[in-house]
Amino acid sequence: MKKTTKQRLAKADQKMLKIVRDHLDYHLIRVRKWLPYNGRRTSRDVVYEAFIDHGQVSIPVPTDRYSFYVCMHEVGHIVKGERNYAYMQEYVAEQYAIAKCIKHGYLTKEIEESAKRYVFEHMVQDCVIRVLPIDSFSKAVLKWTGRTEEQLRRRALRLAKVLYKDSDEVPNALTSLTAKKLSLSAYKALLEITIKQLTK
């Protein structure tokens, strides 16, 4: 049987929940959904996200340090309002979340490493899906992730080749960026351009 929001919140770490609610209230952010915390496993049914234009978030019930960090990450999207490239949006939200974890004594090495991986993967996606040239990425952000331009190039090339070979649809992320619907052949052509750029 599906749990109610009240039942989910009863399982929260009450100290963490108070901190999260204080941040939400201070920044006038409304919770669209309190979602179950899925223990860092990805799930199509549980998606934590921020709706910047509406000042709303869907966040996990904070039960441990990691779920607290996820809450702060989504709050960070609203507070900072970064709308630039995906990797920059995530970097700014991660910096906000890490700062709050440090302030409240919840930062762990695992959280920090997870944040760096997450931002790097968005750099890879921006490189492939948005066809951003590698030298256009922030050097400071790349350095913070602990990766190099060469690592970014190799990872992006690997992803582009997989997508080029296996794709049978245009990603939603790319469709939402274009004024008109992008055909699959146009998407494949974009991937081909990306592969050529990355193999120069």
Residues covered by each model-derived region:
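A metal-dependent hydrolase signature that marks the N-terminal structural subdomain at the beginning
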Residues: 1-37, 196
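Active-site scaffold of zinc-dependent metalloenzymes
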Residues: 26-65, 78-81
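Charged, often glycine-rich, active-site loop that binds/positions anionic groups
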Residues: 45-47, 94, 127
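Catalytic Zn2+-binding segment of zinc metalloproteases
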Residues: 60, 75-92
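Long, well-structured alpha-helical subdomains associated
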Residues: 62-63, 103-200
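Short alpha-helical catalytic segment bearing the HExxH-like zincin motif
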Residues: 66-74
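Active-site catalytic microenvironments for nucleophilic, acid-base chemistry
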Residues: 78, 82, 99-104, 197
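An active-site-proximal "capping" alpha-helix that borders the catalytic cofactor pocket
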Residues: 88-103
